[in-house]
Amino acid sequence: MALAARSAAKLEALQQRLAREHGLEGEPEGLGFGTLVADTSDPASLRAMAATTRVLLSFVGPHSRWGMPVAEACFAEGAHLCDITGEAKYQKLIIDKFHDELTQKGQCFVTACGYDSVPMDLATFLAVKELERMGEAPRAVVLGVGAAKGGVSGGTIASGIHALSDKEISRFTHPHVLADAGDAAGPPRKEPPKAPVVFFQRGFERWGHRGWLGPSIMESVNSKVIYRSASLPWMRPLYGDLEYREGTLFASRLKAWAAAAALGLAAAVFWAVPHLLLRLGAFPRPGEGPSKELRDTGFFNHHLVAESADEDKYATVHVQGSRGDPGYKTTAAMAVECAACLAMEKDSLPGAGGGVLTPASCFGAAVVDYLARAGVTFDVRAGGPGEGAAAPGAAAAAAEAVRA
């Protein structure tokens, strides 16, 4: 294992700091990590880096700006690639450029391996697998964003501003923009219905929620990833013509509408003058972010309801992260575990044939045990309203079903 960055001096300083924090300062082996110096402006350095590894995990962003040289180097050297981006333009570009040839080589590029969109993508997969176990086909999945604590990074803000400044951004807003074209034998991909701003969904009462949902700012990112999962050939029989919706859980319709109004106002201001807000210090700059205390004490709790085609039964999933800020500490841990799963189990994974993949389409439930080491767990339950005790080991059972 090795850490890579542009600056050898900063890499050395990082190694020393991590050794101190983990009580390994002065140990002959230190952290046990090597270091590599590579720069996106130097393609030869990127290829040399990619040539040394089976799986490269990229945290460089905005990916629309810096990601393509890394992807090109990995493609050329045969390395698998994982990233944490939610940038649809970059994801679409690498799909169009690499997907078909990656499938011929059995090489995997797995995108969205962070908070967006591992919890949502895997929860959707586990829910539709549970419906399949019940003998039901899925009609719709609704993800309810619950209690969470975390901050926002300067890099995330920079990616958002970079996207807003892109005159081509409107080409990448459709929910199915990342979906695989498939073949004529597959189910049709119908246009997702326009979701209301505030809506009610049954099934959340199982988790103590009243079922009122308002807007979720990351639905546009997560929906594209999930629709790509649903569209890939080995996933289409399971997902069918699935509809995905996402919202933030609220105690009442009134609170959901109040939050929707506040979010709409904030989005309008950000859309109008993002660069001014950044200069005024309203947001962290690239390289800045939450305090260590917030990174260490953050968490998330989300719930998902998957309805059967006849709307008579449903499966629910509670996905939670308990070991840190979702967008920082937990994202880093999830991405590392995804990369580890790919490195250790590639040949037995659902996505072993390669391509530009999502977490669910590449790993299936095989990554669930890896994510548990990052403090991210999935509680799968089944039944109708008021039914459904916890299904012990449901996620593990799904993993075995996938492998079988």
Feature map (PLM): residue ranges:
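Conserved glycine-rich Rossmann-like NAD(P)H-binding loop of the short-chain dehydrogenase/reductase
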Residues: 1-10
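Structural motif
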Residues: 54-55, 80, 315
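Rossmann-fold NAD(P)-binding glycine/threonine-rich loop
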Residues: 67, 85-107
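C-terminal catalytic/substrate-binding lobe primarily of soluble NAD(P)-dependent oxidoreductases
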Residues: 106, 129-404
